[in-house]
Amino acid sequence: MAVPSELKYSKEHEWVKVEGNTVTIGITEYAQGELGDIVFVELPEVDDEINEGDTFGSVESVKTVSELYAPVSGKVLESNEELEDSPEFVNESPYEKAWMVKVELSDESQLEELMSAEQYSEMIGE
């Protein structure tokens, strides 16, 4: 199972790609595998504020609906609108095509609370 080393991870199975003061957030390959076939994705609007630990959207699979939890706080710069028409990208390409949101960080220290790829791999038993 892929756990890219350049990303950071949350206990709720979100990944975070850091690029300066902007982060890209998505869900991990492990999470999409647990959910099964994704049929719907709900994401926040551009300029919405998200807060660490709060829900910022949801993914619906044939099995269940799962909330998305913000691993960091900040302002949404971009939402991946392609996922509205192609939610299957979450299953097919969780780290590339299926990024969820791009966020301007409001508190960079929150990144220190996220896990490394090695720590995340241990958590999921890989």
UniProtKB/Swiss-Prot annotation:
Subunit organization: The glycine cleavage system is composed of four proteins: P, T, L and H.
Chain's role: The glycine cleavage system catalyzes the degradation of glycine. The H protein shuttles the methylamine group of glycine from the P protein to the T protein. Is also involved in protein lipoylation via its role as an octanoyl/lipoyl carrier protein intermediate.
HAMAP family: GcvH
Gene that this sequence comes from: gcvH
Record organism: Staphylococcus saprophyticus subsp. saprophyticus (strain ATCC 15305 / DSM 20229 / NCIMB 8711 / NCTC 7292 / S-41)
PANTHER family found in the cross-reference section: GLYCINE CLEAVAGE SYSTEM H PROTEIN, GLYCINE CLEAVAGE SYSTEM H PROTEIN-RELATED
Protein name: Glycine cleavage system H protein
Keywords from the UniProt entry: Lipoyl
GO-annotated cellular components: cytosol; glycine cleavage complex
Disulfide bonds: none
